[in-house]
Amino acid sequence: MRYLLDTHVIIWLIEDSPDMPPDIKEIIKFPENNVYICSISLLEIAIKMNLGKLTLTVTFDELLNYIQTSDFDILQIEDEHLKKYLELPYIHKDPFDRLLVATAKAEDLTIITIDENIQKYDVNWVW
């Protein structure tokens, strides 16, 4: 299977949060699954850290190193993702999450998310 991590999942992974369900951890760590992180999630984390709205127990460099040394693939924003973004109904106000939905649709990925607004879209998701 092919999965896209929502930003909160990345944060919960790096922070080893007890909020992360064990079955979701298993999906992410299962070697036959391909797990992707969208570059927009990294931008969202950087912005929130810069504004003081997010504090992690690791630095941003350590977060990047964790991602690079794990088995995650980074998806850059592509033209097709932006086209899908423009086609989305305005269910969710958060532009970062809307771009994650568009990316998942364009790349045929299942989003791992607890976000009920993302779950309202016509996109595969799991939690």
Which functions belong to the PLM regions below?
Residues 6-8, 45, 85, 104:
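Generic structural signal for small/hydrophobic residues in well-ordered secondary structure
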Residues 1-37, 53-65, 107, 116, ...:
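Short, well-structured N-terminal submotif of metal-dependent ribonuclease cores
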Residues 9, 41-42, 81, 100, ...:
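Alpha-helix capping/helix-boundary segments
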Residues 57, 69-114:
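Active-site neighborhoods of divalent-metal-dependent phosphate/nucleic-acid chemistry enzymes
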Residues 119, 124-127:
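Basic, glycine-rich
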